Amino acid sequence: LAYGQRPVDLVNPLVDSANSRWFFFTSATRPFGMVNLSPDMGTAGAWESGYRYNQKTINFFSHIHAWQLSGVPVLPTTGEIKAHLGPKAYGSAYSHDRETVEAGYHAVVLDDYNIKAELTSTVRVGFHRYTFPKSDQSAVILDLSAQLGPSGTESGYVKKVSNKKIKGYAVMEKTIRRPKATKVFFAIHFNKPFEALHAFKDGKLLGEVKEFEGEKGGVYPVFTTQQGDQLLMKVAISYVSMKQAELNLNTELPHWDFNAVVEDSKNQWNDYLS
């Protein structure tokens, strides 16, 4: 170690990220965290999905990368809504030159949308900070029909709680090794109000909704942003209930200090590595 360095400063999450599996890569997560938040370039196949260093498009940011399980994929966008066309349409180009990958923190610029996305987490809550350009139609896509590795999203449910909160669940379809479908419950909070909650289903935009339920669809809250506006988003998960997801969020992340969570995550990683 050089003077002033800590073990956590030497961690390189990108090692073996060109040809690993969807559940190997770890960046914006805690040691043994239930949330394992990171970008996904590949979506299908046991060896062709998750964070793939040499692939050129980020499809979404998923909160679960586990053996036979994934889920709760999101992506911020600007301009024309392409959520109903799938991740191959709404995904974004990026450059490793504008990416920072560390233990407990991941930042990358989505070139198609000129959005800087920063990710960190607590054990059960993914924490996002998005820096937007000026746009009359900024959005955050929650795709409840996405595939990652062998784990596809069978269906989902979302309810608008307020103009800053939504809740729901994703039903992850069974796999060869996980013979039953699994519900992933979530609670999502924003630090700023969204103007409306919209939905998509079966390749079509449905317009504004208060609730969504079904297959092959999802939702996207929309915002108007000015240059440099920062939107913070918390995504808590539970395998028990929506109420438990809300409890996890309020217990683990009652504040909006993103930098403090990054620092706390790094300290926890350093403790494990020391």
Functional labels for PLM-detected ranges:
Residues 5-274:
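Accessory carbohydrate-recognition regions in carbohydrate-active enzymes
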